[in-house]
Amino acid sequence: MIRKRLPKSVTVLVVTICIISAIIVKFYSGESAKEKSFTISTEQDIPGGKNLIENKPRESQKGQKQEETKRCKPKKNVVFLKTHKTGSSTITNIFNRFGERNKLVFVVPTEKQNRLGWPWFFQEEHMIHYDKIKPNMLCSHSRYNREVLDRVMPEDTVYVTIIRDPVAQFESTFSYMTFGEILGISNKTDPLEAFFENPKDVLVNYILTQDLRINSDRLKLIRNGMFFDLGLESKDFDNMEDIRQNIQRLDREFHLVMLMEYFDESLIMLKNLLCWDIEDIVYFHHNQRKETHKRNLTNKLVTRIEQWSSADKALYDYFKTLFFQKLSNQTPDFFRDISVLRTKNAGLRDRCLDFTTEHNGDYQDVEIQGFKIKKNLTKAMETSCDKMTWNEVKYLGYFRYKQKKLLETTESLRTLWDYLATFVPFT
């Protein structure tokens, strides 16, 4: 029996497909062992991990919601709208680690910074485009613009954010952004109280005497900073009807609004929403002030802050009520997961960290807690611990480099395909 020889064009096509497949596989699986080994869910990595596994309830004892979570598929398309001084840097690290493990594509700013056009509304020109590749995650500072986000992100994207008690958030922002120094009242005994003696006069004096180009970005957060991040225009800060409508809009458009004061509870809600594992949400706190920089506020000052940032207060009160409604409907498994998360976090701190350190934050003189990784860890554990301490800027640099390589690989493959198409009849 004589076998017919395949046409030369078909042979070339088959070889080409094999080459392209090999390149793609090489790109996505070619990380070093160090890059691939930072999952931290094994028993030996976490003190008490074996007991946690052995003490799990039997399948027959688990609630229906946990069974549904077990069957669901992990969601990988997420917009995390960062708000200022709400614990969002910690959550960003969680998303960054998950995205790296799962080889997801991130929205990366065009400039070498950690902001996507903020304080301006997010626009497509604020991000690096990777041809026809849709990003999976956005978790850099940006100002909420749903119309543009809908064009940029996949249709099934999950939208989440986090807010905080507006009094604590304002006090933290005032300190972190060094508003006392910017506004020329740092020489006062208490710059925060000095500001609230007459905030409008302080701001008018600043406008008349200072170069507005220098610190104007920061001062966008001097009033209703969280709602500003979430898209409310400053002209509407005193319009209660517009505030109410915008709160309802955010309620419709966001799948979850977390609360900093209930951080672990929020993370378990996030885990269940995204169908992730507890190991995906372990964390070290990022961007925290030293305790010595924190202060207690008088009742009078609390009232003034609430009146000054009344839009933020309305925002927080609304979503706090919704949060507690969700909390009241949780099963015992939900609260067990909180306990497991805290145990894992404590174990990782003990295993990974020698001690916390202090370093200056993004804004000059404010001291922020940092991390010192223990020595004599295994290489895999050292990498795992180290990635948990990476701040947003470091991760963005990593993604910017990694995704540039992805773009170059894609363009090389397209060039190869176009070249072959000039002499291989594919039809």
Language-model segments: residues:
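Lumenal/extracellular "mature" regions of secretory-pathway glycan-modifying transferases
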Residues: 2-256, 261, 276-427
